[in-house]
């Protein structure tokens, strides 16, 4: 994680906006009815959200706009990297699972890391929406929001794409793998 101040320098701010704009223009199919100027205005008005997008970026998420909520006026960003973000892999599901491990503990958990970044784990529906925009996680997998009933029994959900199909799986929440991370969403 970067600095706990949760504010970007003027240079970081400028560079991130430039990068996000470039990605936005390059991937118009993800947001065909959205104009960059409107997104940029929201970002400029919400520096804490820009900080969270920077955290998504530096951990390998390649965030991009995927939707506009007309009711709230918010723009929705998802991690759009082809594979689960590299800086967020080899982690278990949540803090409880991390504490449960007696040895070989991972460095962090998906739930804690996403909270620290100011983002939310994707839900199953959001993950499926993301997969409508391209082929993601064909070599990796990503933890997603898990129902309390499954979590209470020690499990957690993750998803990936194999054989041109999106799959939902379960695993022990304390498990972690080099090819499993998490994807996040952020509303601005």
Describe the function of each predicted region.
Residues 2-120, 124-188:
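A binding-site-centric feature that preferentially detects glycan-recognition modules on secreted/surface proteins
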């Amino acid at each position: 994680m970067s600095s706990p101040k949760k504010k970007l320098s003027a240079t970081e701010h400028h560079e991130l906006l430039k990068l996000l704009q470039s990605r936005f223009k390059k991937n118009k199919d993800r947001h065909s009815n959205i104009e960059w100027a409107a997104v940029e205005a929201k970002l400029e008005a919400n520096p804490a959200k820009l900080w969270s997008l920077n955290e998504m970026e530096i951990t390998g998420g390649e965030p991009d706009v995927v939707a506009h909520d007309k009711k709230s006026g918010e723009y929705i960003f998802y991690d759009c990297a082809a594979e689960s973000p590299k800086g967020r892999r080899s982690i278990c599901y949540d803090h409880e699972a991390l504490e449960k491990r007696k040895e070989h503990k991972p460095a962090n958990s998906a739930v804690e890391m996403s909270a620290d970044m100011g983002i939310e784990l994707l839900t199953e529906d959001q993950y499926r929406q993301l997969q409508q925009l391209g082929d993601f996680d064909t070599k990796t997998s990503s933890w997603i929001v898990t129902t309390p009933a499954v979590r209470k029994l020690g499990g957690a959900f993750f998803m990936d794409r194999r054989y041109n199909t999106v799959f939902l799986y379960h695993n022990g929440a304390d498990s972690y793998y080099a090819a499993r991370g998490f994807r996040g969403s952020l509303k601005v």
